[in-house]
């Protein structure tokens, strides 16, 4: 899907334009680098934050098709990009926030998931996602 077929600017340009607003959703001061927009990624995730480098990554291969969805058409693609980026900023500001907290969350989840160690990362991330999305919904 191209910008001309949707009538909107390309996803990389939207992400660049929405990045300051995404950070402002949480705080006027963050130490995050501008998002890295990846045409190719070894990860299947839509987007993620690397707490070691304080950088957000967006998988354009996964994100671009979302621009043609009902959600993008009703809210507008810019708002969808804003929500995606603000969610990732939330991983920095709220949950987990840093590597030490991420490790503590993983330890708690591991103790609750008896004999399911392979699920710890996914469950910990889902818990953080719920906290972030709940907070974003309240804004």
Per-region residue spans from a language model:
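Basic/hydrophobic alpha-helical interface regions
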Residues: 1-138
